[in-house]
Amino acid sequence: MFKHVTVLLEETVDGLDIKPNGTYVDCTLGGGGHSSYLLSQLTEGGKLIAFDQDEIAIQNAKDKFSSYGEQFIAVKSNFRYLSEKLHELGITEVDGILFDLGVSSPQLDTPERGFSYHHDAPLDMRMDQEAPLTAYDVVNNWSYEQLVRIFFQYGEEKFSKQIARKIEAYREKKKIETTGELVELIKEGIPAPARRTGGHPAKRVFQAIRIAVNDELKVFEEALEAAIEIVKPGGRISVITFHSLEDRICKTTFKRNSTTPELPPGLPIIPEEFKPKLKLITRKPILPSDVELEENNRARSAKLRIAEKR
């Protein structure tokens, strides 16, 4: 069963300031938590289009929301194709868009998907199981320098070089086939005192490989820019991030689009192309409450930012 505890549920959807007859997009359907709450606030004229690249998530949502008929449309696609897929549906503007950038718990908890360092499984980590690049390819074929870069940039791993050296030495003798093998190599690359602090020693490297396999940061950056263009004036965008790099992309994109650039003094009016596109609804990110953190440990790194189209 596709179960998933939704993070910052009400804050994210209520932050969109739902119009009951509006058209909305959930870019990250997952277990359907945000979609379910959003659909419950729509009248017959309202519509929700939900994206996911996971076939199981799509089928689950079609069953779960079948009573909504044509009000709910599930699109099996990466949200990097947000504009194209909406245009195919004849939709050129919407009233609100939400992103929840966490990996859905069913993906983490399904051992054979290879996302988890708690289960031994083939090295996969693809959110779209038809995509060509896998974690196996990254771990076995990428150069030492490439591995160091992603471990450091995407995982903020202090021992990136040591871990990459262990991987490089091991794969000269034998291909690294499973998550279990990779976990052991990561542990060998981290000094014993450091292994005992800061959660599971493989956490940061697994995150880095997952981001690389799915090209997550570039995809999000492009999709957020597209969302700003698609949302109507007065419409809103809600974004939940779980990683400092994702949050930085969201923060800087929102800030850049909500401020007026420095213009030559004495201009009688601000040219239209220089007027800010957005108004920030959240100056600082909204964080999960203590109650939510007690109920769902995976929410601990979540941050919610909301902006409104001018």
Curated annotation (Swiss-Prot):
One of its GO terms (cellular component) is cytoplasm. Keywords: Cytoplasm, Methyltransferase, rRNA processing, S-adenosyl-L-methionine, Transferase. GO terms for molecular function: rRNA (cytosine-N4-)-methyltransferase activity. It is found in: Cytoplasm. GO terms for biological process: rRNA base methylation. It comes from the Bacteria. Its EC number is 2.1.1.199. It catalyses: cytidine(1402) in 16S rRNA + S-adenosyl-L-methionine = N(4)-methylcytidine(1402) in 16S rRNA + S-adenosyl-L-homocysteine + H(+). The keyword Transport does not apply. S-adenosyl-L-methionine binds at G32, G33, H34, D52, F79, D100, Q107. Specifically methylates the N4 position of cytidine in position 1402 (C1402) of 16S rRNA. Belongs to the methyltransferase superfamily. RsmH family. This is Ribosomal RNA small subunit methyltransferase H. It comes from Bacillus cytotoxicus (strain DSM 22905 / CIP 110041 / 391-98 / NVH 391-98). The lineage of its organism: Bacteria, Bacillati, Bacillota, Bacilli, Bacillales.
